[in-house]
């Protein structure tokens, strides 16, 4: 059986990347929450 996680840098960036987060209101909320928390990495 094939495992569910098949890593791909392109797919990772296109679905969870910074620019994708900034496109939607909810995504910007995620970035702001991570900024407020002091996360070193805001997005993938």
UniProtKB/Swiss-Prot annotation:
Q: Which cellular components does GO assign to this protein?
A: ribonucleoprotein complex; ribosome
Task: Cite a single GO BP annotation.
Answer: translation
Q: Does the keyword Metal-binding apply?
A: no
Q: Where in the chain are disulfide-linked cysteines found?
A: none
Signal peptide positions (record):
none
Single GO term (MF): structural constituent of ribosome
What InterPro entries does this protein map onto? Answer: Ribosomal_bL34 (IPR000271), Ribosomal_bL34_CS (IPR020939)
Source taxon at top rank? Bacteria
**PROSITE patterns, alphabetized:** RIBOSOMAL_L34
User: What keywords sit in the KW lines?
Assistant: Ribonucleoprotein, Ribosomal protein
* Gene3D superfamilies given in the database record: 1.10.287.3980
HAMAP family, per database record: Ribosomal_bL34
* PANTHER family listed in its UniProt record: LARGE RIBOSOMAL SUBUNIT PROTEIN BL34M, MITOCHONDRIAL RIBOSOMAL PROTEIN 34 FAMILY MEMBER
Record family assignment: Belongs to the bacterial ribosomal protein bL34 family.
Please identify the protein, giving its name as recorded. Answer: Large ribosomal subunit protein bL34
- Source organism of this protein record: Albidiferax ferrireducens (strain ATCC BAA-621 / DSM 15236 / T118)
Name the gene.
Answer: rpmH
């Amino acid at each position: 059986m094939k495992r569910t996680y098949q890593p791909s840098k392109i797919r990772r960036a296109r679905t969870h990347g910074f620019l994708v987060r900034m496109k939607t209101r909810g995504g910007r909320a995620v970035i702001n929450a991570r900024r407020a928390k002091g996360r070193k990495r805001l997005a993938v």
